[in-house]
Regions:
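Structured alpha/beta or helical-core interaction and ligand-binding surfaces enriched in interleaved
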Residues: 1-159
Length: 159
């Protein structure tokens, strides 16, 4: 009996830290649209956290989220629900293209109760879980060069 080893990718793109719409960055964020499409296809449910000042992102998610809750400690808004075509359009496209579509402070995606994707700090840190070899290669091909030089991979607990 053979089992496929599943891989987790831990991606860091420091130049994206705190990036907000309209702020120039040295890293192209063109990778976001195909990466978001990829991770959302693997997901059943989503959780997105928007900081209070992320009004554009909040307006995008308000009509498509099943549940919305304000976090007491920092006033951030948390959105939950099933991944639907409407959610995919909002998360993938944002209000525009390029860096304007990477508006999300935190994203967690799950499939059948297992976490499959986590994004933090507007994309500075991303984790993908349970990838096959082919899926890993696909994701690595999508990433900007800055992330390729700073990535680490782990398979079944080894780094």
């Amino acid at each position: 009996m053979t089992t496929d080893k599943l891989t987790s990718l831990h991606i860091t793109i420091p130049d994206l830290k705190g990036m907000l719409p309209g702020v120039e960055t040295t890293v192209s964020t063109a990778f976001w649209v195909p990466l978001a499409q990829f991770v959302l296809r693997r997901s059943g449910t989503f959780e997105v956290v928007c900081m209070r000042e992320d009004t554009g992102a909040i307006k995008l998610l308000m009509p498509v989220a099943e549940t919305i809750e304000r976090r007491r400690e920092d006033g951030a808004l948390m959105f939950w629900g099933a991944v639907t075509p409407e959610v995919t359009r909002a998360v993938v496209g944002g209000h525009g293209s390029g860096h304007e579509s990477l508006w999300w402070w935190q994203i967690a995606l799950t499939c059948d109760g297992d976490q499959v994707f986590v994004l933090q700090d507007y994309g500075e840190h991303m984790d993908l879980f349970g990838l096959t070899g082919d899926e890993t290669a696909t994701v690595l091909d999508l990433l900007p060069f800055a992330a390729r030089t700073a990535r680490s991979m782990s398979a079944t607990g080894t780094r």
